[in-house]
Amino acid sequence: MGREKKQEYALFTAWGASFIATLGSLYFSEIMKFEPCVLCWYQRIFMYPFVLWLGIAVVKKDYRIASYSLPIASIGACISLYHYVIQKVAAFSAAGAACGRVPCTGEYINWFGFVTIPFLALIGFITIAVCSFIVIKNK
């Protein structure tokens, strides 16, 4: 497979991850009526613009977006990881109890004993970061 095709597929995959993450986030808050905590809002702030930015980049085949999306996705992943640690590690849970009206330690979902909303966001951010790295590597 040629370099440009790899870039194209990686960029589309990154956009797809951001689109699915945004739809999932909106589903949980608007349909299921789960109120987001403060850290969830920060994760949304980092995730939602990717749908537009990466969507435009896919249409225009503008692979330069990867140099911006990689650091932004990495910051979002750090926020998600911190949120996940607050939920799952007892020693850190005291930090999340007073982060706003809704405690950051709350787990609206807990699939298979480890999949929570911050974990899903973390997977989305990691997917975007890895795809951005692939785009940069194949320039």
Curated annotation (Swiss-Prot):
Example of a GO biological process term: protein folding
One Gene Ontology cellular component annotation held by this UniProt entry: plasma membrane
UniProt GO molecular function: protein-disulfide reductase activity
Family matches, as Gene3D superfamilies: DsbB-like
TM region positions: 8-27, 42-61, 68-85, 113-135
Alphabetized UniProt keyword annotations: Cell membrane, Chaperone, Disulfide bond, Electron transport, Membrane, Oxidoreductase, Redox-active center, Transmembrane, Transmembrane helix, Transport
Disulfide bond entries: C37-C40, C99-C104
Localization annotation: Cell membrane
Mode of membrane association: Multi-pass membrane protein
Keyword Transmembrane belongs to the record: yes
UniProt xrefs under Pfam families: DsbB
Function: Required for disulfide bond formation in some proteins.
Family classification: Belongs to the DsbB family. BdbC subfamily.
Protein name in the entry: Probable disulfide formation protein C 1
